[in-house]
Amino acid sequence: MRAIGRRIDGAPAASGDEDWLALGLEAMRALDFERALTCFDEAVTAQPTSHAAWYSRGMAFYNLGDDTAALESFTRASGYQPQSHLAWYGRGVTLVEMGRIDEALEAFDQSIALEPDSYLAWLAKGMSLIDQQRWEEALVVLRGAIERHQGAAQAWYGLGVAHLQANHAGEALMAFERSVELQADFDLAWYGKGLALLQAERVEEALEALTAATTANPQCTLAWMRQAETLEQLGRLEAACAAYGQVVQHTPTTEPLHGQAQRQLQRLRP
């Protein structure tokens, strides 16, 4: 979800001589979130009722991973400007990171009510419904996101996930294919395509998609693991061991996936 939240082009426009706000937005575009936060702190000190400054401060905290401070800033922004759909959106994505999904969905609903054409709130709501395994509801909402922005690779990816979980392999495959057409290096969309192809029993094509996922992101351990399992089932044990080795290499030892891959390697290489 945090990747969705890193959208600063929709920040409220500065007005008057709000130099600190402008400098902060410039720093956000440069992905210098610490400098941006310093500027936004100055902005809210100079203009403590500026919802634009509070919203932007929230985005800086959000990108720095300080969700408690981000939520406080977004709450201040919505307090000063209750009609700000961006402030409600910011609250929503932060609440998702905090695991407060029901509250996040309420915030996204409020954002959509204020600005029905903002695809980001539709997208975030759809992905949150996926987190709650509410597949059919997610499908409806993600279609709404795509209607508003057909070029949103993340929305097509989410649509694919929901279709896959609802056992709609054909629809899932079409959605994942559209996602990677829009963003060729989207590793999770390639991974999803691989899963959809496996569900459709198109194993060789699935391996190609899983390989594309790990090419796009060599640390995509989910794709490495599924690739390894599939290769093992096909009897290609040397290639399977190499893929399990990639899982071990790229997964922290504290994560269950690391142990699973390590055990598979030990079993295949006694």
Tell where the protein language model's regions lie, with residue ranges:
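Structural signature of tandem alpha-helical TPR/SEL1-like repeats
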Residues: 30-42, 64-76, 98-110, 132-144, ...
